A protein has these predicted regions:
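Short hydrophobic beta-strand element within catalytic cores of glycosyltransferases
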Residues: 303-306
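Short alpha-helical donor nucleotide-sugar binding micro-motif in glycosyltransferases
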Residues: 272-278
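A charged, aromatic-enriched C-terminal amphipathic alpha-helix characteristic of glycosyltransferases
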Residues: 42-46, 330-338, 345-384
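Conserved donor-binding/catalytic core segment of Leloir-type glycosyltransferases
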Residues: 187-206, 212-217, 227-230
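Donor nucleotide-sugar binding/catalytic pocket of nucleotide-sugar-dependent glycosyltransferases
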Residues: 126-185
Length: 398
């Protein structure tokens, strides 16, 4: 079996998805086209142009099905390469543009969100199989589509949202390496130090202002803790994260604590080892449709702590969630305080030699999701067989 896989904005989570998918189905001949995750407005509007005129030979080869991410401008790509319209097609949605928070920085550009929203709608309508990584992603997408269509002036087709409601939910599978048993020995001298990891992109949508508020209250409370600031960095880091680094350095120096790691860890094994040594994985996100960073840390033994919003209540119990002001992501002292209360409680448990609560994320491993992805691929190939049979049974003209 031969498949074409398109990833139009190949961010780290998108790469993890396609790599794990190929590991799950090694007998399929996968042929990939990807584009770097940068220049977002150009990438989502121009990917069809880039591929159609730079990679036509790859696009017009013989395939059994097409699997593409929702960032692909599939309707335009089919117009440029009509042969693609004959392939059974699955569209995988890692995120949607309807539930993306606005950057609070007044200096940040304010792109018009309608164009990427419309492009994602066109691509979804092209799909024979539409798949989301979480129910939260699916519901916010459908709600966003309905709201967008209600604002359009005229000639809006009826029933578009209903056409999309058949969409499946299949999460991005976690690599099997994060489920390998790891030794979590605790240094006696570290028993009173809570090891916290924040492993997210250094961008505004990951809630750096709330993270700063949490750290400020933790320091004011006198808690002995270490915070590892991981995740991808970019040329301009949000101001709260810049303040945070200096604050943490002073905190660790004052208490004689070895500072946590700060910065992206490119080596996968080293990254997993650090996560496996931490006590708590903290999220302050304003935007997460699955939360792969938190899931990986949880699989490696960290106790997760996340806001009670976005996708997190789908797979974390109430003991792992702190109260928030809602999905608007407004950072408040009360919001930080609820997270700090939980962290102080867990620090006390650790100091007493007690085990911290653990969340079960086994359902996200490759082996657990294999059957769901197999059913998806079977549905695609079955639709191809049906189409071929219908073609074979069509009477010849003349």
């Amino acid at each position: 079996m031969k498949a074409l896989l398109l990833s139009a904005y190949d961010a780290e989570s998108h790469r993890l998805w396609r790599h794990n998918l190929q590991a799950m189905f090694p007998l399929i001949q996968w042929h990939e086209l990807t584009l770097p995750a940068r220049y977002f407005p150009w990438r989502v509007r121009g990917n069809s142009l880039s591929w159609a005129f730079n990679h036509r030979a790859t696009l017009t080869d013989n395939y059994d099905f097409l699997l593409t991410t929702s960032m692909t401008d599939l309707s335009a790509l089919r117009g440029f390469v009509p042969a693609l319209a004959r392939l059974p097609t699955a569209v995988y949605c890692h995120e949607n543009q309807f539930a993306y928070p606005v950057n609070p920085d007044p200096r940040a550009p304010r792109p018009n969100p309608v164009e990427p929203q419309m492009l994602s709608l066109y691509t979804a309508l092209c799909a024979d199989q539409l798949v989301f990584n979480s129910a939260y992603n699916r519901e916010t997408f459908l709600q966003g589509v309905a709201e967008l269509l209600s604002k359009l002036p005229d000639h809006v087709p009826a029933g578009l949202v209903e056409r999309l409601q058949h969409a499946r939910v299949i999460p991005v599978p976690l690599s099997e390496d994060v489920f390998a048993p790891a030794s979590r020995s605790i240094d006696a001298s570290e028993a009173d130090v809570l090891n916290i990891v924040w492993n997210h992109r250094w961008e505004y949508d990951k809630g750096p202002a709330l993270l700063l508020a949490i750290v400020e209250e933790l320091i004011a409370s006198g808690l002995r803790f270490r915070l590892h600031l991981l995740g991808q960095r970019f040329r301009q880091a949000p101001a709260p994260l810049q303040q945070l680094q200096a604050l943490l350095e002073r905190h660790c120096a004052a208490l004689g604590i070895e500072p946590g790691h700060s910065g992206y860890i490119a080596d996968r094994q080293s990254y997993c080892q650090l996560l496996a040594s931490a006590d708590v994985a903290l999220s302050t996100a304003l935007h997460d449709f699955q939360g792969l960073s938190l899931l990986e840390a949880t699989a490696l033994g960290c106790t997760p702590l996340a806001p009670r919003r976005l996708v997190y209540p789908e797979y974390l119990g109430p003991e792992f969630l702190y109260d928030t002001t809602g999905d608007n992501g407004e950072e408040t002292a009360a919001e930080a305080h609820t997270a700090v209360q939980r962290l102080r409680d867990w620090a006390q448990r650790k100091a007493l030699g007690q085990t911290l609560p653990k969340a079960d994320v086994q359902r996200f491993r490759q082996s657990s999701l294999q059957a769901d992805y197999a059913a998806l691929l079977h549905a695609l190939t079955a639709s191809q067989v049906t189409a071929r049979q219908n073609t074979d049974n069509t009477p010849a003209e003349g």
